[in-house]
Amino acid sequence: MAGEGQRAEPEREGWALYVTPRAPLREGRPRLAPQNGGSGDVPAYGTPTPSRHGRREVRFSEEPPEVYGDFEPRAAKEKARVGRQIPLEGFRPDSAKEEVRESAYYLRSRQRRQPRLHEAEEMQTRRAALLQQQPHSPPPPLRPSPVTTRRGLRDSHSSEEDEPPSQTVLSQTVTKKAIRRTQETPVMSEDPLISLRRPPLRSSRSEAASVQQKVNFLEEGETEENDQDSFDSDVTVKVRSGDSVESGDQTTRSSSQYKESFWQSSQSGDFTAFDEQPLKLSSGYQKTPQEWAEKTVRIRTRMLTSSPGMRSIYGSFSDDDSVQKSELGNQSPSTSNQQMTGQPKSVSSVKTKRYWPFAVIAALLIGGFLYTRPPEAETTAVQEFQNQMKQLMNKYQGQDEKLWKRSQTFLEKHLNGSQSRPQPAILLLTAARDAEEALRCLSEQIADAYSSFRSVPAIRIDGASKATRDSDTVKEEVDQELSNGFRNGQNAAVVHRFESLPAGSTLIFYKYCDHESAAFKDVALVLTVLLEEETLGTSLGLKEIEEKVRDFLQVKFTNSDTPNSYKHMDPDKLSGLWSRISHLVLPVQPENDLKKGICL
């Protein structure tokens, strides 16, 4: 590549003036020299080989021609229809023509080209020769094109893979512990038009490698360091991360003791350098190596504060922070690094992180106070009911444990309902003849315990006193007593000798004991049934006792011998009534210490 001459462009005549020029053919790679030492038949680099004549050159489109290196606008072509046209290739320097050919090759062939070591050395040698031939006249700035931009991005990725991690540009070897000051390479200023180039193509590297960053460094207040440097200029630093910039005897190398992970994180800046520009400032003033060393230290510090990888460490810093530049202008790398690491975060973020735990705690306390605090009235009612039941347990010690446990749990659950109660609590107590007084006392005291919080006695209805009366009249009386009592604040009622009521009158309990449409749902009804047996065995289970009570009521309400019972009650109605009053059936045992007519 170093010794390749420039090809002469053929002149266009006749109809060729009106035809869009075809893109240059892809130049083949140089063949490897034979192993036996003979190299007479090895073609020069760039010579098309006959072995690849069958490959078809695929062009994406005939328009626009700018894609294939022809940057002449369409309007200029239409005006200059007559006359000899001079190709634009002639006005480009040799290095630009070479790049156009290579870029057209890369555009048609998407496969990444892996540069070799000897090719990189030849390119560096040719660039050094061009710089020596033109020391005082810099070449005109090239118009950036999509092709050259893609090539710059691709070469930056290739050079990152080829070069060892110990080599870097602009001394990116900065850690949190220390900054080693090394020799720095002067970085040239670029044409502002370069910043307007098209974004790079999608690459297989990480997203951080596709983001290009510009670091603007404004020279100001440097009269105390350099008496000659009295001008202000903006230096745009664009360095391709991973490429080595060689100028004279100045090189940039990193220490081998830094870790590989930090090297990869420093690559994410993806700075871009253009090798075609001489190492000069835009103002034409060239500094000594010592001045460049001091200048690059400040540039390096600015890049660290504005790079995406380090921005999360130092907080949020803007690239045009004048206070930051004035403080870092006269400091050494180590001093500036210590100052940067000690920089606090923004005031708003600190205040937010300081006060948000208190806000969360306050919200939790308020929510717990409003939603998790149980109602004080219901808690007190349950506690009062439990105290009353404990007293009854101490008085009536002859009762079975199942009576206390099941009745207390059943009524306490209904009393402690935090939501609206779906149905009333129905408790049915039964006993034999020997426990008639205990049945009466316990039923009344349990109902009073349920309503003890309201300090009102339970409603009492005696069915034995209404046995011989008309069923319709008894039905109206029972309905009136229950409805008036519940409306006046009483929430419990006890009905003694339920089996003695006229059969027709018991249908009123459909209204008060229904599962879904009960007239009062936040009340408790205690019903008692006195069996005809003399003694109720203690060995009977709850299921057997429930069946015994059901059979007894069926005989009592449907027997034709019973007055006023047959025409008002049938088995279907009795089954519906039984399903509503048999929520919980519990037996009551006799008490020896209980006297007739006096409860304990």
From Swiss-Prot:
Annotated Polar residues bias: 247-261, 325-346
Coiled-coil regions listed in the entry: 376-452
A GO biological process held by the record: nuclear membrane organization
Transmembrane stretches, start-end: 355-371
Superkingdom to which the source organism belongs: Eukaryota
Record's GO cellular component terms: nuclear inner membrane; nuclear membrane; nucleus
Annotated positions of the Phosphoserine modification: S61, S137, S145, S156, S158, S159, S189, S230, S233, S244, S322, S332
Subcellular locations according to the entry: Nucleus inner membrane
Composition-biased stretches (Basic and acidic residues): 1-14, 71-81, 91-102, 116-125
Keywords: Coiled coil, Glycoprotein, Isopeptide bond, Membrane, Nucleus, Phosphoprotein, Transmembrane, Transmembrane helix, Ubl conjugation
Stretches for region Interaction with TOR1A: 373-600
Membrane topology: Single-pass membrane protein
Full protein name: Torsin-1A-interacting protein 1
Organism: Bos taurus
Species lineage: Eukaryota, Metazoa, Chordata, Craniata, Vertebrata
